[in-house]
Amino acid sequence: MAHKNELNSLQVKNLLRYFIDNNVKLAGKGKMPIAIEIEGMPGTAKTSVVKQIGDELQYHFVRLNLSEIEVCDLVGLPTYEYKICKNAGKKDEECLWVSDKVLGHYIAMGFTALNEHRTSYSKPSWIQGKEDRPVLLTLDDYNRVTPMMANACMTLIDEQKYISWGLPKGSTIVLTCNPSDQDFMVQQEDSAQATFD
């Protein structure tokens, strides 16, 4: 189990900056970034410190309160895609999967809709438009999630992607928690959650 230290806000900020800088280096080497967990009493500025450093680094700051959302909020909305081809069956055939929203546009450009379709998922609204620079994703109340949400979060933490979308290169995930030894309604973390190995 990971060792827990008590730090003040400035120390937390410096530690976060170290992890963020390290994650940029890891991403540059094609390695997965490391998530960091901050545990503290409510009102001790855990989320504020993360937002402050995100603003200083000009990262997109996204905060998800995990006790208030469901797994579908991580997945995104279902969309229907259709397979279309230009010059079908010829050497220069070009085929794409497009959503029903742009199908007419591609047909007008000379593509033919085939009789193939599939269900896909759009990016969740909270990540759309944030592909241009790294994201500092704060998962608040990490130890207050349901088991299903905990599994979804572990995938996101391990892979920096979930189902149909991924975080931009160089992004960092920060988890915030309330202490499990206090009078809060929290879930005990298992060893995989505590160490992120």
What do the PLM-derived regions correspond to, one by one?
Residues 2-197:
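AAA+ P-loop NTPase catalytic core and its hallmark functional loops
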